[in-house]
From Swiss-Prot:
It is found in: Nucleus. InterPro entries: Ets_dom, ETS_fam, Pointed_dom, SAM/pointed_sf, WH-like_DNA-bd_sf, WH_DNA-bd_sf. This is Ets DNA-binding protein pokkuri. It comes from Drosophila melanogaster (Fruit fly). Belongs to the ETS family. One of its GO terms (molecular function) is DNA-binding transcription factor activity, RNA polymerase II-specific. Residues 33-117 form the PNT domain. The gene is aop. Residues 133-295, 496-548, 590-647, 674-732 are annotated as: Disordered.
Amino acid sequence: MSKMKMLPVQLSLNSLNPGIWSDVLWRCPPAPSSQLAELKTQLPPSLPSDPRLWSREDVLVFLRFCVREFDLPKLDFDLFQMNGKALCLLTRADFGHRCPGAGDVLHNVLQMLIIESHMMQWHLPNSPVTPTSRYPLSPHSHPPTPTWPPLNAPPENSPFHSSAHSLAGHHFMAPNSVTLSPPPSVDSQASSPPQAPYQNGGATGAAPGSAGGSAPAAGGATNTSNPTSSSASSTGSNGSQPNIMPMKGISSASSNHSDSEEEYSETSGGVSKMPPAPLSYSTASPPGTPILKDIKPNWTQQLTNSFVNSWSQQQQQQQQQQAAAVAAVAAQAQQHQLQQQQQQQQLPQKLTLDNTAGPVVTPAGGSISAPTTPSYMYKAKREFFPENSEPNTNGRLLWDFLQQLLNDRNQKYSDLIAWKCRDTGVFKIVDPAGLAKLWGIQKNHLSMNYDKMSRALRYYYRVNILRKVQGERHCYQFLRNPTELKNIKNISLLRQSTPANGNGGSPSMPQGSSQAPGSPAGQNWNPQQQSQQQQQSPQRPASRNGPMSLPAVAAVAAAAAAAYGPPPTSPLFMHAINGAFHYLSAAAAGPPPNSPALNTPSAVGGPDKFQFHPLKLENGSGSGSESAGEDLKPTDLSVSSKSTATSNEDCYPLIRNADGLTTIKLIRYNEHQVAASPAGQSPKHDDQQAGASNASSSPRPMDQASEQAQPVPMESDCNGGESEDSFRHMQQ
């Protein structure tokens, strides 16, 4: 690796061997010379540290300072109507022509300031410089930095300068670190060839040296792709070694540079981006800048010759590297494209799942990683999903994946999953292991099994997307329409929307042909749906005993009261009796008691027909019992003659869970019915209605037992032909 030439710095205190001079200077830089230190302290503070950033006013300030400081003859300031960039382009002869007798002094002072600014930026990129007007910390505090040649660029009077100084600006604006981009996806690999990151050695590369000596390279990774570019590090008092990584791979001489440039290298594989070099200084090491004490004339000529030679060699090497990089990138891209085409031809055949087949293996012996781009998965998607699947789903969610398998027009996956009742959304997983394997391929998770997939199914229980059908293995039911699920951005919002849907009631079913059990939508009861829901509903399983008529239930209750005495006034006892009453008479009633807001025709119902209203929970949330499991959802057993609950209705705040507690609304009769009741009862009534259609009034809570000793529960849908005396026997 070629050594980068460094400007010679003369040590005033030590006369060392020139061979080891650069190493000693690098490891322990001397203090700045007194002449330059005095010059820096005397300079006006308004002048930027880099003379190339000076404006016209700054140039005039500098000239006036030199005239005053060095007692020079008067200058013709009209000959220096230029900015700092143009002033730095003037040679010694130009200064001598414009101001005879003072041109050499002005040229030498200007060169000292230029070299000092170079040293600050090359050797101390991470030095904590005090933020002054000469060393601004913010890149926005001074004009934009022009593209300028580095130390190894030809000087201003060199013929190479006009055509190559913009290219060299990349080395001058070298950043200090390399930022790695995220791992490449299939999209980036398929659309663009792979590109290698810039190598950042652990220990830094070459150290700067004098014109006659060479700098030793510290231990570290050697970058063979660009011999002229090197890394440099300066060790401060804290021992840190900041890295300097010059940018390479410059393809054009334009001054408009992108924020990041990438180049392919054979020595590394990956993607990296070089951030733009900020004109700021971070805290890494204290400033210790080796500065020229004075410049000898013969050194100036040596520097010019070395700059020109190194620049020409660097340009040739960069052109060769660019040609090699372009050829390598083209070959790599062509090879990658061929591999991609082969994989596209082989993948659809292998993605067709066979239940008896082993793990899907690529020709190279590795596992298939499921494609993630639509263009890469286009053929395989036709094997998985129906052609009329809705956009923006792609089966990436489990419920959508199951829907697309179930709705396949050719029923190719009926041996894995099949509908049991499409109208109500009930389906069965025929082959759990095969379905989990197919889901693992879809999710690029080849170790997927049914136990892992069932976790997602159990999560769907909590958000009311699915529920498990009791009495049959691997049988589930959709509780929400796919269109509704696709319109929900965040699936966790389903927990919040559950109380608004009737507290446990489920919305419309897929296909929209029928309603789910417990649906809040108004729908006439059907005897077939009654028997079906008694088989499927986990909230109210059907009784295995034969149905009992209401008179028989009343007789059993009266016999129990006669045998064991009058029932106690405990609220828990009353609710246990009422819950048993409703549970035993569930088969005799028309609709199941867990169907809220069910509308029955007035022509069939008569005055004794009642309707459900939404359940009132103690905590006001419909998800209070969801954590207990799917069998612990609340059941609505309250009845009312109105379709919606009024504000003055009281409901016992109990939920039918595994404990057997239920929420029951108490009904009182009209005055002509209470007159026939036992004399021991004197219930307090609200405003009564004259019509027979309004058969209930506001209930009383259990803590007011003195006013209403034993309220009478009513079944949700009593037949008009049955006598009401059977209910009164329960009070005796």
